[in-house]
């Protein structure tokens, strides 16, 4: 079985390769929790997929793609922490956002994902 770091590396690479939300679902446990810390948490694989699909969509004002650039990654057992720069591609521009992510991996699947970032920075860059 893959180590928790390997699971998270593959997940970040899948985002960077524009993997569709329904395919990203395979990375999560059925009862996973996804929490962009400035927002409310999302529980359950299907709800996570719907959330991802709602903000990765072509055309204005949607986000056409996000590349997860992992700067540093570390694990303590099943908990993996990533220091990232997420590069957002919009129809008319792109921007980068520093992010700290914490993942919990259970039996080779992501059971919790928390991203910490500056919401003011994100909204100002989205326009």
Model-derived regions: residue spans:
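Short acidic-aromatic low-complexity motifs
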Residues: 1-30
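Hydrophobic/aromatic beta-strand elements that line small-molecule binding cavities or substrate pockets
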Residues: 52, 68-73, 85-86, 98-104
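Short beta-strand segments that buttress and anchor functional surface loops
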Residues: 82-90
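Short solvent-exposed loop/turn micro-motifs enriched in small/polar/acidic residues
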Residues: 64-66, 94-97
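Short beta-strand edge/turn micro-motifs at domain boundaries
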Residues: 98-124
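A solvent-exposed, acidic/Ser-Thr-rich amphipathic alpha-helical stretch
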Residues: 21-78
């Amino acid at each position: 079985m893959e180590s928790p770091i390997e699971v998270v590396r593959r997940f970040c690479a899948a985002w960077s390769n524009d993997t569709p939300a329904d395919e990203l679902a395979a990375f999560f446990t059925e009862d996973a929790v996804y929490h962009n810390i400035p927002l409310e948490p999302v529980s359950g694989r299907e709800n996570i997929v719907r959330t991802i699909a709602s903000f990765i969509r072509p055309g204005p004002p949607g986000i056409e793609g996000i590349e997860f650039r992992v700067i540093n990654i570390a694990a303590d057992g099943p908990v993996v922490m990533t220091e990232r720069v997420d590069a957002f591609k919009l129809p008319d521009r792109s921007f980068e956002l520093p992010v700290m992510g914490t993942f919990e991996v259970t039996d080779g699947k992501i059971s919790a994902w928390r991203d910490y970032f500056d919401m003011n920075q994100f909204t100002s860059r989205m326009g």
